[in-house]
Amino acid sequence: ILLSVLLLSSCSTTKNLPEGAVLYTGIKKIEVKNEDKTKPGEAALEEVEAALAYPPNNALLGSSSIRVPFPFGLWVYNAFVNKKGKVGKWIFNKLASKPVLITTVNPDVRVKVARNLLNEYGYFNGETSFEVIPDPKNPRKAKLEYSVTMNDPYTLDSIQYVHIRHRADSLIDATIGDRILHKGENFN
């Protein structure tokens, strides 16, 4: 068993990648600037982080930043991707893991989704960006680093009901404690 692990560990995880493709190895970090520590701010940041997360090959429990040290699925993929026999195809179909590429992760779209989520929570001046960080040992592998700047949220300054008839006005006054919108809350 030790011999097979050593043989597999000598296999390249990038040898069957298409020309110009880069293997995604996870998120290096998500840097948050001007973080809002309020409950709505934490909820917004949780959704933003979920939108940016994408597990790489051999992710540990679906984590986008922690990986198992042995990419067994990629090794099997590279060893059996071009096999024609029944056994080779069976092993490939059961054990292989298709490489997750930077283009598959699509970080451009992910930062746009994250920015839209910030807008939904009232952070209209929020900004998101990403950077591809190449692996120093293998330029065909890279991690992503995201930057999220929350800035101050827009809040509700005043709430007015206009052109309300007398009866409706008294109903509104009677149920004022049940309102959904309150002055000072995030524009959400």
Residue ranges and their predicted role:
Residues 1-2:
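Sec-dependent signal peptide recognition
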Residues 12-188:
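Interaction-mediating elements
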Residues 7-10:
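C-terminal motif of bacterial Sec signal peptides marking the signal peptidase cleavage site
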